[in-house]
Amino acid sequence: MPELKVSAIKEGTVIDHIPAGKGLKVIEILGLSKLSNGGSVLLAMNVPSKKLGRKDIVKVEGKFLSEEEVNKIALVAPTATVNIIRNYKVVEKFKVEVPEVIEGILKCGNPNCITNYEYVTTKFYVISKNPLKVRCHYCERTMEEEEILANL
Amino acid sequence: MEWKGRDVISIRDFSKEDIEVVLSTAERLEKEMKEKGQLEYAKGKILATLFFEPSTRTRLSFESAMHRLGGSVIGFAEASTSSVKKGESLRDTIKTVEQYSDVIVIRHPKEGAARLAAEVADIPVINAGDGSNQHPTQTLLDLYTIKKEFGTIDGLKIGLLGDLKYGRTVHSLAEALAFYDVELYLISPELLRMPKHIVEELRERGMKIVETTKLEEVIGELDVLYVTRIQKERFPDEQEYLKVKGSYQVNLKILENVKDSLRIMHPLPRVDEIHPEVDKTKHAIYFKQVFNGVPVRMALLALVLGVI
């Protein structure tokens, strides 16, 4: 495998197998642009991948993301794998999983839903993971994959 | 589940046991109301009715219910007479009103508004309709009406007629009926069939369902015919609407071959889907249904206030 063009990190988290083009969204959802520990965040886009054809990779220096935190990106990057790095070595590896409840990331696609008018954190219940289907806690309307992606 | 302080937002939050508690409390209160006239359960309590959208039956029956329970009522019947017109948020309106009252009833044009209100308020909130989403007290009074007429809900053949696609009333009613052993007949024009995901969910819950476009073919089977309005604006052109409209009107002719015990319900307001000539037949119970709104709402108010 050709060596990556971005440097390896000593300590931190590598989020691999992000669908090409979703890397920036992943950074946004995880709030990584405001990393307070002084560590760097490296983003590689459109990297060749055996599994996906093309993929994005995000490397977060000096921060170990928990499964719960990372699961927030499951909607934009369901294929993502997460590697926890210590002393340049992968010490833990897991796949992202769609959580049971999604809070704050998603906008309700129902134009008449109160969440589109009032100051309120959105909340959705995942009623099916495959195919993905969620129900709004407020207006109770369901959204399927295509609509979900359009409202992220 | 503890009733005192509980919010009534969606029929989805109800178990069968919850429904039964409401129905039996309503029965008890109706009886007491007949005996004593005026009750005292909610003496000293204040209900706030916040109607951001107009309503005749729901608002007046809630107010009547609170008065019958011995409580008092404050509120507004349209948003234009409140600070909402000045741009006040729902959150702030609720935070304010809860300082003045013990329970809130809200109707709002936006879906999810009642759920949000319930989260903002420390006092119980009852949903009286949020956009096209939920209207749980209507469903409860419908169930109460059926139970009162037949003594039971189990074993009945119940037909839902009209706009089954957009009608929130029929969706909630169908979901609640899934707790009981009923056969459900879904009668509507092709264009206004009940959404597939709801029909599937009901079937998964073990309900026997017959879908048809022809009222005359199934009406002879039914114990209950629940009629709803077919709105003109749902059709691409007027001709199509007129074609459909005629075949879904309940009149004396179509009632020639029905069971003697058939009961016809309607959430009202009606336009012309039930001919007024039907009103005087023994089948028509839609005005009794209106009456039943009072004991059912009395029951809900008394339960969430924790005074019964």
UniProtKB/Swiss-Prot annotation, chain A:
One of its GO terms (biological process) is 'de novo' pyrimidine nucleobase biosynthetic process. Its cofactor is Zn(2+). GO terms for molecular function: metal ion binding. Coiled coil: none annotated. InterPro entries: Asp_carbamoyltransf_reg_N, Asp_carbamoylTrfase_reg, Asp_carbamoyltrfase_reg_C, Asp_carbatrfase_reg_C_sf, Asp_carbatrfase_reg_N_sf. Zn(2+) binds at C108, C113, C136, C139. It holds the Pfam family PyrI. One of its GO terms (cellular component) is aspartate carbamoyltransferase complex. Signal peptide: none annotated. This is Aspartate carbamoyltransferase regulatory chain. It comes from Pyrococcus horikoshii (strain ATCC 700860 / DSM 12428 / JCM 9974 / NBRC 100139 / OT-3). The gene is pyrI.
Curated annotation (Swiss-Prot), chain B:
InterPro entries: Asp/Orn_carbamoyltranf_P-bd, Asp/Orn_carbamoylTrfase, Asp/Orn_carbamoylTrfase_sf, Asp_carbamoyltransf, Asp_carbamoyltransf_Asp/Orn-bd. The lineage of its organism: Archaea, Methanobacteriati, Methanobacteriota, Thermococci, Thermococcales. Keywords: Pyrimidine biosynthesis, Transferase. Belongs to the aspartate/ornithine carbamoyltransferase superfamily. ATCase family. The keyword Cytoplasm does not apply. Heterooligomer of catalytic and regulatory chains. Catalyzes the condensation of carbamoyl phosphate and aspartate to form carbamoyl aspartate and inorganic phosphate, the committed step in the de novo pyrimidine nucleotide biosynthesis pathway. The keyword Transmembrane helix does not apply. Carbamoyl phosphate binds at R57, T58, R107, H135, Q138, L268, P269. L-aspartate binds at K86, R168, R229. Its EC number is 2.1.3.2. Pathway: Pyrimidine metabolism; UMP biosynthesis via de novo pathway; (S)-dihydroorotate from bicarbonate: step 2/3. Pfam families: OTCace (PF00185), OTCace_N (PF02729). SUPFAM superfamilies: Aspartate/ornithine carbamoyltransferase. This is Aspartate carbamoyltransferase catalytic subunit. GO terms for biological process: 'de novo' pyrimidine nucleobase biosynthetic process; 'de novo' UMP biosynthetic process; amino acid metabolic process. GO terms for molecular function: amino acid binding; aspartate carbamoyltransferase activity. It comes from Pyrococcus horikoshii (strain ATCC 700860 / DSM 12428 / JCM 9974 / NBRC 100139 / OT-3). It catalyses: carbamoyl phosphate + L-aspartate = N-carbamoyl-L-aspartate + phosphate + H(+).
